[in-house]
Design a protein with these regions (language model features):
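C-terminal (or distal) subdomains of carbohydrate-active enzymes
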Residues: 131-134, 156-158, 183-193, 217, ...
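CE4/NodB-like, metal-dependent polysaccharide N-deacetylase domain
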Residues: 97-130, 134-137, 190-204
Length: 800
């Protein structure tokens, strides 16, 4: 007869319908209760995940922490999960999942002498297809989840092998019924026993008061001891999975979806902040490693770890899913603010450290101040004013750089004159100081390059021409009208009715990458709650942004900008369409003044074919276009069109269109409740975002473009000095075209660099790279995540 393993637990949401301070209290009280029950019920065992909870207890109550350590040693307290908490399992990037394991498993090993063997995300709203490999390379062979249910996923398997694209497998258990069986629902244990007998396989039943903590109570344990159900055993997940060894199990490949499709896009603030913080921390790590290599400056490990923990905490599924109360997002904002402050400080320290050691004098004497010298830039008659442009990306990058200066000439590191463009700045400091300069920089992989500005002393505001709001340039290599913009690579046309792109022609490929006019539209989602429970679609179309106003903002040798403003109901949409010289994509900067309740803003692109490729953690997934709302990462592609975004995670496909979800006017934490005067609506007011439209070639290229969109080049205005560094440097080189590098950081155990990448095209091949002067030769299996030290030694995601 099949056994039922009784798993004592307490599902604890540190944030949901309460703030984290209350969550802290519930964790403390629940852990105390579990320890007390162990004294009263010798057979009772307790299972708990989430490294952040243990860290709170360690800091707040060392005596309780010592008790937990002893119970872990006895085998009565089981540590599962191996992550900082139970995150949303669709939205975080691959590196976030890697840091969940890195920071948590090492903590468990240090404090308890064990690591989690079982992944544990019982309440997360879906699970991306890359998780089996991530789990395996984080030291976990098993996985416990509950959502989606058998009915939601349309699959009957509850115990199975879950396999990712590279072939990695974990044993997975889908919790039947509930993760928090309490005294009033003990009959469910009998039902689970019947199901286990019917399927002839052992199963688990999870008992204990949950959501707001609590765990197994005296009453519950007393009643469980009186159950007349045979073959029950007090257990922990590791014990259960050990009993499955050698058994034949079905194999499920791909993602585990769908539950609560509205969570891919609810609360735009938390989604955008997550992407911004992830991108900045990854850039800070790369810049810090560059500075360490070039200047010897110390790598800020502890500060970056603190910042990563902030990001990981905010990835908790009820926070990141957008379904918590409004004050919870104020708290999330505080963590994001601290994270961005740390990231920006460390980026600045790294860049200043490098810039200060570059030989900007080039053998010339130090300049002396002369009357008429530019008032807020260092200036040298022969050398101009140096600008050091930095690239954190591990590939050569060409992007525009915006300077708060107006020179008359610019040169690159070789002294070659380069084009630049005077544009209107964002300041109005009198008539003299309201302009900026834009130029297109080319910087090597994880490198820098010095550019120089030269000023004409007699230049004044009267020499700048401004006609009809358009800043005139000396040359005009880009063609732009109100309804069309063009460079040597693409031509972009606008629809006079919708005020949106209606054609993008790829000159190099000789193809159109759109099949008609794009649209900005509203969906009526009155029937949805915040989660969009039991809804495949967010709603039906109920409004369209039209009556466009066209305005050419910029034309010049570097870029052209057309601003198009449209309205719908009470909302206004302002979009700047930007085409740069040398770019094969059109960048769109959006400012939406959104005042819609129970409505969703979507941007629709007519390019969908039978499938859509979407970025997921450390990889991609190809989905059939079935119409429903789906999760995505930093880019999606269907047919010839690719769309990169800077913080949007949901899309759908319908009637030949891919529709990116931008904003949702849902009620905070509304589970089909009363919608009255007390209801507070999310995403109201002004929101900004960006997206990039371009021709799709392959996943490796798409990853690069998305990373560049989310973190552009940085620059430092420099002075004059000698130094050991040249005016151009690159710290990375890679010959392989089918990998995406996601991280370059300092190893956890030593002083070596660590580089991580994943294979993008589903084909094995050689990988040759050079990192900080050290050559690395290895191979990448299809869809493999690989972590290497600079000497070529392979380690897992825990760097073991």
């Amino acid at each position: 007869m099949a056994k039922v393993h009784l798993i004592g637990n307490a599902h604890i949401d540190p944030v949901w319908l309460w703030r984290w301070q209350e969550g802290f209290s519930e964790i403390r009280a629940t852990f105390r209760s579990a320890l007390d029950r162990m004294k009263e019920f010798p057979e009772f065992k307790f299972t708990s995940a989430c490294a952040s909870y243990y860290q709170w207890i360690e800091k707040m109550d060392p005596e309780m922490f010592a008790e937990i350590k002893e119970r872990v040693k006895q085998g009565r307290w089981s540590i599962v999960g191996g992550w900082f908490l139970q995150p949303d399992c669709n939205i975080p990037c691959g590196e976030s999942f890697a840091r969940h394991g890195l920071l948590s498993q090492r903590y468990f090993q240090e404090k308890f002498g064990v690591t989690a063997k079982t992944g544990y995300n019982v309440d997360s709203f879906g699970h991306n297809a890359g998780l089996p490999q991530i789990l395996k390379k984080s030291g976990m062979d098993n996985y416990v989840f509950m959502r989606p249910s058998v009915e939601e996923q349309g699959r009957e398997e509850e115990v199975f092998y879950w396999e990712s694209a590279d072939g990695s497998r974990v044993k997975a258990y889908r919790i039947p019924e509930l993760y928090n069986i309490d005294a009033g629902r003990l009959s469910l244990i009998g039902e689970i026993k019947s199901r286990a007998d019917q399927k002839d396989i052992d199963m688990m039943a999870f008992y204990g008061v949950g959501n707001h903590g609590g765990g197994p109570t005296i009453r519950l344990l007393d009643q469980m001891g009186k159950l007349k159900v045979p073959d029950l055993v007090y257990s922990v997940p590791d014990q259960y999975f050990a009993g499955l060894e050698g058994k034949e199990l079905p194999v499920l490949k791909g993602e585990l979806q769908h539950h609560a499709r509205g969570c891919y896009s609810a609360c735009s603030f938390v989604k955008t902040s997550n992407r911004k913080c992830e991108s900045h921390l990854l850039a800070a790590e790369k810049f810090a490693m560059m500075a360490r290599h070039l200047t010897g400056i110390r790598y800020p490990k502890k500060k970056l770890e603190k910042a990563w923990k902030n990001v990981l905490f905010n990835q908790f599924h009820d926070i990141m899913g957008g379904c918590s109360i409004r004050p919870a997002y104020e708290d999330a904002g505080y963590l994001y603010g601290e994270t961005m402050s740390i990231a920006e400080q460390e980026i600045n320290y790294a860049l200043q450290s490098i810039a200060s050691r570059i030989d900007t004098l080039q053998g010339e004497a130090l300049p002396s101040y002369k009357e008429g010298t530019h008032w807020h830039s260092w200036e040298h008659e022969a050398l101009g004013t140096p600008v050091v442009v930095f690239n954190p990306h591990p590939w050569e990058t060409q992007m525009s750089v915006n300077l708060n200066e107006v020179p008359v000439k610019m040169t690159d590191w070789e002294g070659k004159e380069i084009p630049f463009q005077i544009i209107r700045g964002d300041q109005t400091n009198g008539n003299q100081d309201k302009y900026h300069t834009l130029f297109r920089a080319e910087v090597g992989a994880m490198g820098y390059a010095v550019y120089r500005m030269f000023f004409r002393k007699e230049a004044g505001a009267e020499e700048r021409k401004e006609e009809s709001g358009v800043l005139a340039a000396e040359t005009n290599r880009l063609s732009v009208t109100e309804h069309q913009m063009e460079n040597d690579l693409i031509r972009v046309e606008f629809d006079s009715v919708t005020g949106d792109v209606c054609r993008i022609y790829d000159k190099k490929a000789g193809r159109d990458i759109l099949r008609g006019a794009c649209r900005a539209l509203l969906l009526d989602e009155t029937r949805c709650d915040t989660w969009a429970h039991n809804q495949e679609y967010l709603g039906k179309e109920c409004g369209y942004f039209t009556v466009p106003e066209f305005q050419i903002l910029e034309r010049g040798p570097v870029r052209a900008v057309v601003r198009i403003t449209t309205t719908c109901h009470a909302s206004t949409l302002q979009r700047d369409f930007i085409l740069e010289e040398g770019s094969s994509g059109v960048l769109v900067k959006v400012k939406a003044d959104f005042h819609e309740k129970h409505k969703t803003l979507k941007f629709a692109f007519p390019a969908a074919e039978k499938t859509t490729t979407a970025a997921i953690a450390f990889g991609t997934i190809v989905r059939e276009n079935l119409g429903g709302e789906e999760p995505c990462g930093a880019w999606i592609a269907s047919g010839p069109l690719a769309i990169a975004n800077d913080g949007k995670y949901g899309y759908d496909t319908t009637e030949g269109e891919v529709r990116l979800t931008i904003l949702r006017g849902a009620v905070y934490a509304d589970h089909y409740g009363d919608r009255d005067l007390y209801s507070e609506y999310m995403d109201q007011g002004v929101h900004e975002c960006s997206y990039l439209l371009y021709g799709y070639t392959d996943a490796a290229d798409a990853e690069k473009r998305a990373q560049e969109l989310n973190f552009p080049l940085r620059h430092v205005m420099e002075s004059f000095h000698g130094g050991a560094l040249e005016e151009k440097e690159s710290c990375f080189f890679c010959e392989s075209d089918h990998i995406a590098v996601t991280a370059v950081k300092l190893s956890e155990d030593g002083e070596e660099a660590v580089v991580r990448f994943f294979e993008t095209e589903g084909r094995s091949g050689k990988v040759t790279m050079e990192l900080f002067g050290k050559r690395i030769e290895t191979t990448a299996a299809h869809n493999e995540i690989k972590t290497l030290k600079a000497d070529g030694t392979e380690v897992n995601l825990l760097e073991w």
